[in-house]
């Protein structure tokens, strides 16, 4: 039972919802860093422990996941979006086997690092990480639009990006039951809903004529290109895992 609670604590955003959201003692950037570190800790723990998560904990994780989905579709802040998506995917990180959870967790974290960096780009050039008024970036800033599209498409579980391949691999490696089917449907369509909501206007909408658009500078573009290459490598790993 203790291991179950530790896994829930590390993956599902429990410290954020119980403490940091209420007190505001950490900024949005630091919350993302801390959340990512906790998830990495959970992935390490899952690889050194053979413990099977109990169904009550999975149900709690699913309930927390639905709450995170609600928060994700309500926020316009890209920093918040990055860690809400991380919390939303907690049931899969808990329910997958150690190897499958690790692969999915790594690809998820890399995609979210990309989203987080896009939040920093927004904050630096538009005054905040809020994407609501900065619409149509693909037409106005092609490089920023391309990278945002890549990260959101990966998070929406579209192949050939690694998130979808690792997600499918985790499902194929698991012993499915009714709870599994419910979790898979929630996570799959939830990720899709979150990504499409942002892409509809922010990425593919009409540019706001009141905004002076600034594209990614070469240094930023290089960082995002490296992240994209790593995602491609993970896609190859995902294909290999599916073929084994």
Where does each model-flagged region fall?
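Alpha-helical transmembrane segments of multi-pass membrane proteins predominantly involved
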Residues: 1-244
């Amino acid at each position: 039972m203790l291991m179950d609670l530790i896994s829930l604590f590390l993956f599902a955003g429990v410290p954020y919802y119980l403490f940091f959201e209420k007190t505001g003692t950490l900024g949005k950037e630091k919350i993302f860093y801390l959340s990512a570190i906790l998830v990495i800790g959970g992935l390490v723990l899952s690889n050194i422990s053979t413990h099977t998560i109990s169904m009550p904990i999975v149900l709690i994780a699913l309930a927390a996941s639905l709450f995170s989905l609600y928060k994700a579709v309500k926020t316009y802040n890209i920093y918040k979006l990055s860690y809400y998506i991380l919390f939303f995917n907690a049931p899969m990180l808990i329910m997958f086997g150690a190897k499958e959870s690790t692969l999915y967790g790594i690809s998820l974290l890399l995609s979210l690092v990309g989203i987080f960096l896009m939040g920093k780009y927004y904050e630096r050039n538009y005054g905040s990480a809020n994407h609501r008024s900065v619409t149509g970036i693909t037409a106005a800033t092609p490089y920023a639009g391309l990278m945002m599209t890549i990260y959101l498409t990966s998070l929406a579980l579209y192949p050939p990006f690694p998130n979808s391949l690792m997600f499918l691999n985790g499902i194929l490696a698991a012993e499915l039951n009714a709870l599994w089917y419910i979790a898979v449907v929630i996570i799959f369509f939830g990720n899709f809903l979150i990504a499409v909501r942002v892409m509809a206007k922010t990425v593919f909408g009409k540019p706001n004529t009141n905004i002076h658009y600034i594209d990614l500078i070469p240094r930023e573009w290089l960082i995002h290109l490296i992240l994209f290459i790593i995602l491609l490598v993970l896609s190859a790993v995902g294909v290999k895992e599916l073929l084994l």
